[in-house]
Amino acid sequence: MNQVKTAFLLVAMTILLVLVGQVVGQMIGIGSAGIYVGLLLAVVMNGSAYWFSDRIALASARAREVTAAEAPMLFRLADRLAVQYGVPRPRVYVSPDPSPNAFATGRNPSHAAICVNDGLLRILDEEELYGVLAHEFGHVRNRDILISSVVAVLAGTITLIANVAQWGLMFGGYGGRDDRQQGAGGALVGLLMIILAPIAALLIQLAVSRSREYEADRTGAEVSGDPLALASALRKLERATQVIPSQTAQPAFAHLYIVNPLSGQSMAGLFSTHPPIEERIRRLEEMAGGMRRAS
């Protein structure tokens, strides 16, 4: 199902970029040539989204791949989880960001990466770190990582389109002198793009993020056998991200993280890409109670 949704998003990106190419072509006076520019851009963006979305996400976080000698505990826990999940151990990255957080990315379990922020390593104990890694491995095994990474590129593309439309309105004029009405119509569409594009990008992120976080919480807690450790980690991360702003997280990639990296910013909670931490913790505590009763 995730593969079908990913294909749908790639097709949607193609259609969007072709339409945008047509509108921008009218705005800057190149006519239907804008359609071909949009199609070419769609080919480039779709290829980048599928093959390089993980590299884009990791570069955005300024993450560096680490070795077992540099991060022995991370590798020990990751190797253990790889066996439990029955997947290859993902590549391990560390971001210098002091705001504690983590995310998984990649095309599939054989081409996956897990990134943890330096701030996370500083505040979590081993059990909590294990719970967070188990959550991220859940995304890998559930094959959430490709669609989430593609959505990140799509959201970034939509934001870029809004910026291009803004520059087109400022400097592109309103089409050729012989076609003022068409140019004015293109300008109106461009203005609507500026207003609606960021909202569309956010709605796409919301559509793929919230339910997957609940599922990764459940999967991670089941595999680790310790829902309360993950619940404790979520409490710490939620408090810390409120007071330690992220230095690397970009809005287009916010939905990848285990907790919203932009939660400390104004208006961030209005359309959060993540479900409420309180509800996630409640579900984990309920799981822990069920495990105790079953034992």
Per-segment meaning from a language model:
Residues 16-21:
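Hydrophobic, membrane-inserted alpha-helices
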Residues 190-195:
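Hydrophobic alpha-helical transmembrane segments of integral membrane proteins
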